[in-house]
Amino acid sequence: MDVKAEAPNGPAPVKNENQNQPKPQRENMNMNKNQNQNQNNNMGGGGGPNKRNNMNMNKNFQNRGGKGGPGMGPRGPMKNEDFIVNSKLKNLAGPTHDLPELVCEEIKFSGRNRLYIGNLTSDVTEEELKELFSPYGEISEAFINAEKNFAFLKIDYRANAERAKKDLDGRMRKNKPIRIRFAPNATTIRVKNLTPFVSNELLFKSFEVFGQVERAVIIVDDRGKTTGEGIVEFARKSGAMSALKYCSEKCYFLTSSLRPCVVETFDHIDETDGFPEKSLMRKSNDYYKARQNGPRFAEMGSFEHEFGTKWKQMYDMYKQKHDALKREMQLEEEKLEAQMEYAKFEHETESLREQLRKREQDRDRQKKEWEDRERQADESRIRDEQQMRRQQDDMQMRMQRQDEEMRRRQQENSLFMQAQQLSNMLDQQEMNHQGGGGGGGNGGNGNNQGGGGNQGGGRRNYNNDRNNDRNQNFDMMNQGGGNHGGNQYQGNQHYQGNQDQGNRFDGPPQRGNVRPWNNNDRGHRDDFQNKRRRY
């Protein structure tokens, strides 16, 4: 890309390398380039760096954060003046006991080295001024107002500026004398209402948050005692304006004392050169009228003495009022200081009371929480004990039921064994009866004596020791007569427990266990089960 030489009053024109491209594409590329080339004075950290200044930069973006660059970086945060001041104040928070000592070195091109050049002509140029002042040092920030015929410039050091002022002031240029004096420094402020414990270092650090500070001093009297005032010189006018704004709108404290500093613009007083004779307008009538009489003393009782005395009385009255106002101001300051200390003590006391109340509330809360935990632990222990007791009772009940079930099963088994033995005995008895009564059945005629064979059997008693010594009597006598022969109706009553078993001989046949003697079928017995119950 071809770049021409820079013009004196503006940047050089830049040749556009996209001129040979189609118009829509060229417009899009220019738009993207303008978006990526925006630079901001108070920009945040954005994406890729911007190496060139965009001539068509929109002024509305000066206080905005930087956008993301070609690398698609995130947009930087909005950093305005409040954010910068608060960030610097955070670094100063805390004790300021051991501040480093300031190095008193003269700053090059400071605001104190700025000269005012007046009574110029409209054809003056910057090259001419630089050529005129270059023998006295380096020149910077030359500004010319051709309409009002004055200019400003900075010389590197104060001594060089004073030498240039002394040599060039009153020099003739195009039949007009040049007027040179030190320009009023708009970057300097006066700080008042300072405590006796504010030093040059603390003043420098305190006002450095508003901008770069070149010089900060505390004004002292002839005994070296601080007067409660100081002077701060900034490198830029924006720093001084920022300090004036913040200290006027807010209360800015430099120490622990609740005594805010008061910031005012600094009125420059020239105590070096003063007002020379060449600065007077000698052609005016007032000048000639005032210079008709020279220095003299007035005679007592004269007209001059009378009015001279009145002027002195008025000045004395001013001085008295000024001193009275100063004393009153001092008394009010002491009174306010005492009130401030008392209010500060009360505030600290109330803060301690509030902390004590909070501690008591925390103690009560912790005590309540501890009591709640203890109560919950007791309730949990009681519930566990009750649950354990219920479990033990349930276990004992289950054990008792198991024992009862076991005893019941043992009784059932014993009864079943007894019933089985009784059944076996009855079966054996039936078999014996069937074997011994066969002949009696055949020999019976009509005389009801056919059962004689059965009488031979007689009456038998079976004693069972295993069934609790039960006596079982079985009568084998045939009461049927001739028609029945050897068949008998035998009514047997089976006893379980401690009952007796017997035969009924009269009445109709019983249905307890009626079975023919010659019937050996044992499949239809209904007294006990044949198979043993399993447990």
From Swiss-Prot:
PROSITE patterns: RRM. GO terms for molecular function: RNA binding. SMART domains: RRM. Residues 113-185, 187-268 form the RRM domain. Residues 1-80, 346-411, 429-535 are annotated as: Disordered. Residues 65-74, 434-459 have a biased composition (Gly residues). Residues 27-42, 50-64, 486-502 have a biased composition (Low complexity). Residues 521-535 have a biased composition (Basic and acidic residues). Keywords: Cytoplasm, Cytoskeleton, Nucleus, Repeat, RNA-binding. InterPro entries: NOPS, Nucleotide-bd_a/b_plait_sf, RBD_domain_sf, RRM_dom. GO terms for biological process: mRNA export from nucleus. One of its GO terms (cellular component) is cytoskeleton. Component of nuclear connecting fibers associated with the transport of ribonucleoprotein particles from either the chromosome to the nuclear pore complex or their transient retention in the nucleoplasm. This is Hrp65 protein. It comes from Chironomus tentans.
